[in-house]
């Protein structure tokens, strides 16, 4: 059997038991919830718009997000297997907000994140209601020194029609649009110092390429303070014999190491996942916290990450953060002004 054929067989076996995804939500219901109050900014590219909504303020948008998330993640080998991907993190009292990029010309939600100020996810008894707490053990230092000043990012997605592999023109700026939204959140929450979350890899990703990528992240973006670690029962180590590339990055700066990583991953028939690529090229001081299995979501693999906002490269700050003042005025971009 060829490479991946057994994984493909298992994937299709699982797919048989998945529910049919719901029909698209009516555009008029979505547009009615894209209010001035929910508007964050216009994007740097594509004349798209970024909004911040939640299940309680925009139930129809939330339903469409649930549909698009399931469509996107299921297509990549993950997903819930349900008719739409909405869980208690979206709907509970300490609910996440939904950061979305909207294409007004196509009338489509093209991409999204769910986000929460971590101090809003702690109840009166001190229990932490964060997605990452299901997979990672938080140190006391992290709880006291980092969590109160962090925004957690999760469930990042770009719907299939707007992925570069499907439509290069439309897909080119999909993730970039979301980062414009994150830039707005950084400005609007000046006490926030960190962006915290996890990046996903799917079980069908080549095992050697996966191990090389994790080895690279541990080498260039280590957690020297031992702030977080995967829960013991969910911890995922290396799957292959890493002695073939151990020491491969020793003595190399990040750019040199990245060239080797990119070349080797491509030789193994894969590409570095776009979101991981974005995070790695955002800040030199990013920290990674090991990899855990998400057994609630198609057994995808989650690697914890933390970015210090002050350390984000200036070129990225200029692009996503400093443009907020220019792009934040609702209605300032009419068709006439953008021609």
What are these regions (language model features)?
Residues 42-87, 97-114:
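Short amphipathic alpha-helix that is part of the acyltransferase structural core
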Residues 13-56:
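Conserved N-terminal entry element of GNAT/NAT acetyltransferase domains
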Residues 298-339:
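C-terminal non-catalytic accessory extensions
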Residues 90-100, 123, 286-287, 297-303, ...:
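A short helix-loop-beta-strand connector motif used in the catalytic cores of GNAT acetyltransferases and
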Residues 83-90, 97-102, 137-143, 184, ...:
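Catalytic micro-motifs at enzyme active sites that drive phosphoryl/nucleotidyl and oxygen chemistry
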Residues 102-132:
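A contiguous, low-structure linker/loop signature
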Residues 274-281, 286-307:
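Aromatic sugar-binding interfaces of carbohydrate-active proteins
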Residues 70, 80, 120-285:
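Acyl-donor binding region in acyl/amide transferases
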């Amino acid at each position: 059997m060829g490479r991946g054929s057994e994984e493909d067989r298992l994937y299709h076996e699982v797919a048989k038991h998945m529910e049919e995804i719901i029909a698209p939500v009516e555009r008029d219901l979505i547009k009615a919830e894209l209010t001035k109050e929910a508007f964050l900014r216009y994007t740097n590219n594509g004349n798209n718009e970024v909004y911040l909504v939640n299940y309680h303020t925009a139930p129809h948008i939330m339903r469409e997000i649930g549909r698009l998330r399931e469509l996107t993640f299921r297509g990549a080998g993950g997903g819930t297997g349900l008719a739409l991907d909405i869980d208690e993190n979206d709907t509970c009292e300490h609910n996440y907000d939904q950061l979305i990029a909207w294409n007004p010309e196509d009338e489509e939600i093209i991409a999204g994140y769910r986000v929460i100020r971590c101090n809003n996810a702690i109840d009166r008894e001190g229990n932490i209601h964060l997605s990452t707490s299901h997979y990672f053990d938080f140190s006391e230092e992290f709880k006291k020194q980092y969590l109160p000043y962090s925004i957690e990012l999760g469930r990042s997605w770009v719907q299939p029609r707007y992925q570069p592999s499907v439509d290069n023109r439309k897909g080119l700026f999909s993730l970039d649009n979301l980062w414009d939204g994150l830039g707005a959140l950084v400005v609007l929450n000046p006490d926030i110092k960190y962006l915290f979350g996890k990046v996903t890899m799917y079980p069908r990703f080549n095992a050697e390429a996966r191990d090389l990528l994790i080895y690279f992240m541990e080498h260039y973006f280590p957690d020297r303070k031992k702030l977080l670690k995967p829960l013991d029962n969910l911890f995922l180590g290396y799957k292959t014999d890493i002695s073939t590339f151990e020491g491969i990055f020793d003595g190399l700066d990040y750019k040199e190491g990245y060239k080797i990583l990119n070349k080797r991953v491509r030789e193994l028939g894969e590409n570095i996942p776009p979101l991981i690529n974005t995070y790695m090229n955002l800040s030199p001081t990013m920290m990674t916290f090991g990899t855990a299995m998400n057994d609630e979501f198609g057994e995808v693999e989650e690697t914890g990450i933390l970015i210090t906002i002050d350390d984000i490269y200036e070129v990225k700050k200029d692009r996503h953060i400093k443009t907020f003042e220019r792009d934040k005025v609702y209605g300032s971009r009419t068709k006439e002004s953008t021609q």
